[in-house]
């Protein structure tokens, strides 16, 4: 049985190794070096060639935004709005949980306090 | 073994050459499989229910609001019991009576001893079973230390005593009962109190309130009873007989006896004579009443009985309460009836048409037909001696069936 297990495991490893090979452009770049430098995975997604305007006016006029620049700005705004919305919901959920817990605790205390005064063997101590 | 068949098959030839045949046979398992965890490991039904109905012990903890009882030590009790046994065994007269089958056990004495010893604890258990403490005092309870003897006077010299939940009819409970208890004894020590004692008796019905499900109906309220003499107490609410409506089953009537520390002014609970039959004015809450006076009052006695409807209550509702008598009956769900079709195939047309009509109208028409064939002075016709021997002619087949069934007394005539 152990030999069967070994052979099967070897076959599985071979299949996995073959199936996991992937050839895409970001993989050709030295990602370890880029991560150590704090650079993005895709060099074209961020950087001076991407974010800065392609030309400037000599008389100081502001350069109009390009189509992709505008699209990226709008995307960033949407992401920021989404982050604010979800953070608000998370904060509300936390506060609601705290409020429900406090309500349950106060209800329990109310029930305990509303009990009658115990007598029984306490009357013997008078 | 979670390997696929392909891998298994590809490796099988290698394994066969090296491994023994016995190793392969252990890979398969015959027979059924146990679903879930084995019985010793899985949770039992009781454990499962307990985990689903989690209760906070602090919230459901019960509180004793009654009197304690001072008892002598167990060794002293045992010594007394042994002395009693020795005296019984050395009694020659008792032996002679026993041998000649003339020994009569005094059951009244047995009852008195039982009431003094374990009777009150049994009464607490019975009251717990009937939900008296839960519905009157919430999470509180008490052991009644003062035995209450309550009995209703019947015709002649008969009495209907109130035990621990026996059934007493409203006819038997029409007048105020006689109440007898030992008011000169201290509930704690069992000795004579030595000074004047004051008691309060409240009789209420936790099941009788029509508008407020959590309130009770106050049937009797006597305060400042001196030394157990009920007739000398201050009656704050006159006795109202029980009035269980028809159809609701049994109701509980609970008598609670409180011991007062001193005379109390309970005038705010006085029920005016004009409001004797006003049920709203008789709204009462034992829990609120006791909470308000729990420094002065301590429950000491308890008795209750059950009662249900009888015919005398119709007059009571009409004359005393001055309301229409309520009748409760089960509201069965209506049987399912599909929409009416223009061509109902395979349906007898007369039954099908009546199925979609108003039942009261159908009943009325049946009654009219029956009365039309009944002589106003001679009564209905005598039934035929041999119904099927008389031919039914010149009528459609469905009408012939109706007439035949009517003569035989079967079929739809039994629905009316």
Swiss-Prot record, chain A:
Q: So which domain of life are we looking at?
A: Eukaryota
Coiled-coil spans are: none
Extract one GO BP annotation from the record. mitochondrial translation
A GO molecular-function term, please? Answer: structural constituent of ribosome
- Keyword line: Mitochondrion, Ribonucleoprotein, Ribosomal protein, Transit peptide
| First and last residues of the transit peptide | 1-28
The UniProt record lists the keyword Nucleotide-binding: no
Location comes to: Mitochondrion
Q: Which GO terms describe its cellular component?
A: mitochondrial large ribosomal subunit
Q: Does the keyword Mitochondrion apply?
A: yes
Instruction: State the family named in the UniProt similarity comment for this chain.
Output: Belongs to the mitochondrion-specific ribosomal protein mL52 family.
What does the annotation say about its assembly with partners?
A: Component of the mitochondrial ribosome large subunit (39S) which comprises a 16S rRNA and about 50 distinct proteins.
The protein depicted here goes by the name Large ribosomal subunit protein mL52
Q: Which organism is it from?
A: Drosophila melanogaster
**Gene transcribed to yield this protein:** mRpL52
């Amino acid at each position: 049985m152990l030999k069967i297990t070994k052979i099967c495991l070897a076959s599985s490893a071979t299949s996995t190794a073959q199936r996991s090979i992937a050839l895409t452009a970001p993989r050709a770049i030295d990602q370890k070096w880029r991560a150590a430098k704090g650079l993005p995975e895709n060099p074209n997604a961020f950087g001076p060639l991407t974010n800065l305007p392609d030309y400037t006016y000599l008389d100081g006029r502001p350069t109009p935004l390009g189509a992709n620049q505008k699209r990226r700005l709008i995307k960033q705004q949407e992401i920021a709005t989404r982050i604010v919305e979800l953070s608000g919901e998370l904060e509300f959920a936390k506060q609601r949980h705290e409020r429900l817990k406090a309500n349950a605790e106060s209800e329990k205390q109310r029930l305990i306090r509303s009990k009658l005064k115990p007598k029984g063997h306490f009357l013997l101590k008078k | 073994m979670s390997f696929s068949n392909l891998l298994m098959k590809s490796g099988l030839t290698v394994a066969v050459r090296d491994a023994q045949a016995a190793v392969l046979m252990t890979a398969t398992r015959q027979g059924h499989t146990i679903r879930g965890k084995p019985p010793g490991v899985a949770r039992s039904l009781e454990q499962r229910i307990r985990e689903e109905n989690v209760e906070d012990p602090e919230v459901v903890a019960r509180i004793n609001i009654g009197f304690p009882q001072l008892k002598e030590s167990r060794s002293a009790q045992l010594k007394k019991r042994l002395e009693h046994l020795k005296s019984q065994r050395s009694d020659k007269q008792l032996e002679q009576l026993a041998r000649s089958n003339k020994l009569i056990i005094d059951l009244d004495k047995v009852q008195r001893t039982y009431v003094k010893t374990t009777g009150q604890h049994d009464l607490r258990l019975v009251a717990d079973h009937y939900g008296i403490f839960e519905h009157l005092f919430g999470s509180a309870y008490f052991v009644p230390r003062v035995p209450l003897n309550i009995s209703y006077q019947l015709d002649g010299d008969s009495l209907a005593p109130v035990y621990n939940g026996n059934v007493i009819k409203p006819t038997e409970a029409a007048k105020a009962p006689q109440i007898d208890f030992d008011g000169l004894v201290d509930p704690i020590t069992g000795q004579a109190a030595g000074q004047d004692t004051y008691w309060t008796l409240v009789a209420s019905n936790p099941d009788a309130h029509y508008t407020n499900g959590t309130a009770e109906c106050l049937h009797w309220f006597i305060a400042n009873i001196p030394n157990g003499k009920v007739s000398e107490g201050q009656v704050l609410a006159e006795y109202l007989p029980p009035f269980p409506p028809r159809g609701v089953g049994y109701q509980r009537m609970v008598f609670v006896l409180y011991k007062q520390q001193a005379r109390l002014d309970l005038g705010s609970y006085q029920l005016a004579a004009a409001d004797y039959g006003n049920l709203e004015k008789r709204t009462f809450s034992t829990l609120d009443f006791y909470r308000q006076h729990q420094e002065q009052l301590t429950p000491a006695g308890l008795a209750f009985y059950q009662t249900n409807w009888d015919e005398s209550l119709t007059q009571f509702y009409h004359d005393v309460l001055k309301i229409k008598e309520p009748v409760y009956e089960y509201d069965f769900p209506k049987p399912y009836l599909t929409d009416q079709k223009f061509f109902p195939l395979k349906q007898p047309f007369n039954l099908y048409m009546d199925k979609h009509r108003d039942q009261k109208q159908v009943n009325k028409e049946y009654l009219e037909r029956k009365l039309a064939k009944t002589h106003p002075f001679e009564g209905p016709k005598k039934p035929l001696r041999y119904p099927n021997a008389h031919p039914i002619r010149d009528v459609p087949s469905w009408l012939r069936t109706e007439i035949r069934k009517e003569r035989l007394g079967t079929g739809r005539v039994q629905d009316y």
